[in-house]
Amino acid sequence: MKIEEIYNNWKSLFPLSEAHVELLRNKFTTEYNYNSNHIEGNTLTYGQTELLLLFGKVSGEGDLKDFVDMKASQVGVEMVKEAVRDIGMPLTQNFIRQLHKVLLREDYTVYRDLPGGGQTSYTVHAGQYKTRPNSVLTRYGDRFEYASPEETASMMSDLVDWYNAAEQVGKLTPVELAALFHYRYIRIHPFEDGNGRIARLMVNYIMARHGWPMIVIRNRKKAEYLEALHRSDQKIGKVPSGGAYAAIGKITSFLAFMRQTVCEEMQCEIDIVRNADKDTWWYDGQRINFRSENGARLLKLLQAKPFVTFSEMSDSLSVNRSAIQKQIEGFRKKGYLDRRDDGSWHILAMNSKIENYNY
């Protein structure tokens, strides 16, 4: 099915019921922030992310910075949602810098060990373009340079001007606009840190501004995501200006990845809403296929009775205790559930049957 057909099917879901609006909003809040930050190395679990962002609580171990970064990420999401409501306001560099300031919150110093011994340091400035060259060592072993500090401001000015003009012309689709903006932005890499997170927020700014769904680039597809960018880099070359002014026809690999991602995200929402009368279970954007009906029955029981004992589970499901313990351990490893500090079971998988939605 073509992307336009899936988009039309997605649009046909509206207007959504209040229950579905809440369900999909909470789903996106957890899944977007969890995945976008995990791509950059955040260590919070899916359950910790949900508990923090939906319930305002902290549980389990974790680096304080990871908790703070996750909360800041959601503030960035809300900032994007607020900005797209004013369709008459063009994109500005100031908006991007303010978004970066929200994500990083404050300046901080990075210390790095030198190969021959000793240490060097530099300051990352929240909301300010980079003041030192930045580059990345690719997984293929070569060093990839981004725009220099001296050319960054002018390239960002050109990027924003291009976007506003391209939006008015309307030749590119919203997905093409979002993909090309992401690619050009990453080739500039205007900030010392946080560029990937900003790029993904800007994709959703562009998508939502044009009436398309905000999307999640999944951490499980990180290798595919980076490979799509890399293949486009190979086609364009290493010179930063080549990437900063790339044409849509030069980023076919990355555009294909983005189109596929958008299709999958829209289809996921379609399937969830259209299965509102069925007991289908989802986790991190994927439908769960159970080996037997006992899996779904177990999750439903734990959701309804979070303090249920193993003996009660066994009696209720007519399954022996050891089999239940084994299944629960499997579900925990997959992230479908966890156990809270008070001993209660918390289901992280989502049931699309709206009457079972219990946030």
Regions found by a protein language model. Give the residues of each.
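FIC/Doc superfamily catalytic core
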Residues: 1-193, 197-359
